[in-house]
Structure formats: C-alpha cells, structure tokens
UniProtKB/Swiss-Prot annotation:
Gene that this sequence comes from: trmFO
EC top class named in words: transferase
Binding-site residues, FAD: G7, A8, G9, L10, A11, G12
Keywords: Cytoplasm, FAD, Flavoprotein, Methyltransferase, NAD, NADP, Transferase, tRNA processing
Function, as annotated: Catalyzes the folate-dependent formation of 5-methyl-uridine at position 54 (M-5-U54) in all tRNAs.
Organism the protein comes from: Thermotoga sp. (strain RQ2)
Catalysed conversion reaction: uridine(54) in tRNA + (6R)-5,10-methylene-5,6,7,8-tetrahydrofolate + NADH + H(+) = 5-methyluridine(54) in tRNA + (6S)-5,6,7,8-tetrahydrofolate + NAD(+); uridine(54) in tRNA + (6R)-5,10-methylene-5,6,7,8-tetrahydrofolate + NADPH + H(+) = 5-methyluridine(54) in tRNA + (6S)-5,6,7,8-tetrahydrofolate + NADP(+)
E.C. number: 2.1.1.74
InterPro entries: FAD/NAD-bd_sf, MnmG-rel, MnmG_N, TrmFO
UniProt superkingdom: Bacteria
Name of the featured protein: Methylenetetrahydrofolate--tRNA-(uracil-5-)-methyltransferase TrmFO
Pfam family, one: GIDA
Family: Belongs to the MnmG family. TrmFO subfamily.
Any GO MF annotation of the entry: tRNA (uracil(54)-C5)-methyltransferase activity, 5,10-methylenetetrahydrofolate-dependent
Gene Ontology biological process: tRNA methylation; tRNA wobble uridine modification
Length: 435
C-alpha cells in the first residue's frame, strides 16, 4: 500500500523519511516551489520560517528532553541539524539553507519515495492512507476541502517573524559579543541607555502596522507575539522581556546596560544575524525607521523584513484519536503544527510518532500510544485527550509530565529526574515495541 503525505515541512519530512527508509512506498506531495506560501522562500523541504534556533539540547530543558526522545526514535530533522549547526551557546541553531537542503536530499535519496511537486486540493478519503502535514500555512486551495471533510472545527492564531540584517552593517564599535552570565560569545549585543530605550520604545508603539483580515490581538500566540504588541503592554515590558539586560555586561562600562537587543547568527559564515524576539507586523518602511533608533543598527542593511501570517490548526481533541487519526476516517492522519503542537521540534516529533504507528498498521499491528512519562507521550496526550474547551497551541514543557513518586524540592534536580525517567521509559518502550 502507498502512503500519501501532503506537505514536506518538518512533520511531513519525518513521516516520509521514517517510512521510506524502511521500504514503505510513500507518495510525497509538496506544492513549493511551483506555488509558494506567504512565508516560505524556497522549494526545499523542512524550510524554517520563524527562527533558525531549534532551542536547547540540555535534557533539563523541555526542548532538550524532547530532542533526546526524538533521537531514540530516529529523526532526520536532528540528523540534518547536526550538519547545519551554527554557534548559538547552549541552543541548537542551524544555517537554514544548509539544514533544509540536507533534509531534502535525504528524502530524495530514498528509492521508495515518489515526490510530486503539485498542490493537493482534494483527495478520496476512503482510499489509501493519507497523512495531512500541511502546516500552519495550509494552502487556500486545500482549505475548502479540509473544511468540508472536518466541518467547522478549524481554529487559527497569528504568527510573526523577525528581521535579518547583515553583519557588516552592524556597528561593532558599540555592540559587544557575549551570552548571558558569560556563558559563551555567540550573540551580538546592542546596548541601549535609558534615553535610547525610551526613544526606541516610543517609535515602536507609534509605528504603523499591517492590518490583517480577522485580526484579533487575543489570538496572538504568546511565544511568537509581535514586539510592538509586547511594547504596548507597558513601557518596561520589553526590558523584562526580549530586551532584558540580565547577565549581559557591557565590557566598555563594566555594567549591565539599561536594555539590550540580541542578534543571533543565521548562517555558517556569519554574514547574517536575526534580531532575537523581534517578530513583527510593522510595515516594512516602519521597520527600517524603528531599527534606526537602535544605535548599533543605525546603518543596518535589512535583508529580510519581519512578516506576520495566520496559522491554521484543527480542533484535534474533537477530531482526532490519540494516534492522530481522524475519528471518522481512521485511514487519514494529521501531523505537525496543524494538529496544535507548537514549535519546530514538537512538529517534527509528531511526524515521527505518526510514522511509527503507520508503520505498525502496515505490518498488521495495532497502533501504540507513547507512555505519558515521556515528553512526546505527555504532549500528544495533552493535545488529544486533556484539553478542556477549544485547543490552544501547546509546546513541550515539564508541566505536562506526571509528577515524580518522591517529592523533589530543588527545581533543577526535579527536572533532571523527570528527564532521566522519560529517557529510560522511552528506551524501554522502544525495546519492547521496536520499529
């Protein structure tokens, strides 16, 4: 039987690769580059559109634990990330183009995978196995069919992307290198005095934004909230948020600045840097004007402006079973951010999970739920079984895991024990239920 996968993002690529490398015939549909979305720039698979950071690898961090579990199950996302890694302190950050190219070439190399560069606008829900992994930027051509298939259980939130500037246009006479509390030198820090901060804040809150159809401030998801929305919540909101100076000492003064804008490397050569936490929906002309208020970026060359787009996801608790299958059509699976998991790694992890169970079904076995002691199992259980009311996008966090049997007061030690339990549980699960 052929497995049809719609969408070659992180989740779709994981589904395709994990099935294809095991000899399962897969037909992968990807409309790019023939038809582009409003946020993608290339035709590569697994293109990262929000940030180039895949976050922490430390297992005492929820994102790091998630990665550890994904490696145990097998992840093309993490294999490609290792080859595309750029310096980013304790975080795993990648060169976007190298990363996407690595994933694309890995999928294309599989003999059992057929790649069709066409937009899917409909399919027969009664025939074959389908995996819908079209992501938050699902095409307008497919949406009407999905709405007809699913009913009115579509939700959405708004997402925003940060600007990118060239390294050579940054005033390094005023900027300084460093991570918080002296842990490395991977970030460029642009310090602001009180007067400079207030001038920047005033320009930001007064700047014109791009209005969007159906825009509602309450729909802005907190992890990608536009910087101008944060600024409007209070004059010091940025100083306690993305511009907080904590742990960053300016070597010129020997003190923490009043506020700091951090820039993170975007490519291996270090030619481009993105503004950390600067997701925005400002008009492009306003972005240029506002960034000029930052002394280190007074002459910055912006190579990608921040943009904002609407993300689509489905009401998974109502529509899907725990294996991410449609309750009405169990031959149709959903994977990735369209299910309500939030984040790059969470999206990729859901693709691995779907591939694992599709593989079991094709072998004549029953699908399996991952143990809730694992981060993957806890996240997927929350999305499908534990949400009350309408689903809100959810990312990996330790609050999802069942408590330890013995109370541990120290926060770090508690997370360490939760992580160790999760990894051991996943290892045992895979030993008993291998691919």
């Amino acid at each position: 039987m052929i497995v049809n996968v719609i969408g070659a993002g992180l989740a779709g690529s994981e589904v395709t690769y994990n099935l294809g490398k095991r000899g399962i015939r897969v037909r992968l549909f990807e409309m790019r580059p023939k038809k582009m979305t409003e946020v993608h720039k290339t035709g590569y698979f697994a293109e990262l559109v929000c940030s180039n950071s895949l976050k922490s690898e430390d297992i005492t961090n929820a994102e790091g634990l998630l990665k550890a579990e994904m490696r145990l199950m097998g992840s093309i996302t993490l294999e490609a990330a290792e080859k595309a890694r750029v310096p980013s302190g304790k975080a795993l950050a990648v060169d976007r183009n190298i990363f996407a190219k690595e994933v694309t070439e890995a999928v294309e190399s599989l003999e059992s995978v057929e790649i069709i560069r066409e937009e899917v606008t409909e399919f027969d829900p009664e025939e074959g196995i389908w995996v819908v992994a079209t992501g938050p930027a699902t095409s307008d051509g497919l949406l009407p069919f999905l709405k007809k298939l699913l009913g009115d259980d579509f939700l959405f939130f708004f997402d925003a992307v940060s600007p990118i500037v060239t390294f050579e246009s940054i005033d390094m006479e005023r900027a300084f290198w460093g991570d918080r509390f002296g842990k490395g030198k991977d970030y460029i820090n642009c310090p602001l005095t009180k007067e400079e901060y207030e001038e920047f804040w005033k320009a930001l809150v007064e700047a014109e934004v791009i209005e969007m159809e159906d825009f509602d401030r309450k729909l802005l998801f907190e992890r990608c909230q536009p910087i101008e929305e944060i600024a409007r919540s209070g004059k010091d909101a940025l100083r306690y948020g993305p511009l907080r100076p904590t742990g960053l000492v300016d070597p010129r003064t020997g003190k923490e600045p009043y506020a700091v804008i951090q820039l993170r490397r975007e490519d291996k050569e270090g030619r481009f840097y993105s503004l950390v936490g600067f997701q925005t929906r400002l008009k492009w002309s306003e972005q240029k004007r506002v960034l000029r208020k930052i002394p280190c970026l007074r002459n910055a060359e912006i190579v990608r402006y921040g943009v904002m787009h609407r993300n689509v996801y489905i009401n998974s608790p109502k529509l899907l079973d725990i294996f991410f299958r449609l309750k009405k059509h169990p031959n149709i699976f959903f994977a990735g951010q369209i299910t309500g998991v939030e984040g790059y790694m969470e999206s990729a992890a859901s693709g691995i999970y779907v591939a694992y169970n599709v593989h079991r079904i094709l072998k004549g076995l029953s699908p399996l739920k991952l143990p809730e002691e694992t981060m993957m199992g806890a996240l997927f259980s929350y999305i499908i079984e534990k949400v009350e009311g309408d689903l809100k996008p959810m990312y990996a966090n330790f609050g999802l895991l069942p408590p330890l049997k013995v109370r541990v007061k120290d926060k770090f030690e508690k997370r360490k024990k939760l992580a160790e339990r999760a990894i051991e549980t996943m290892k045992k699960f895979l030993e008993e239920n291998p691919w």
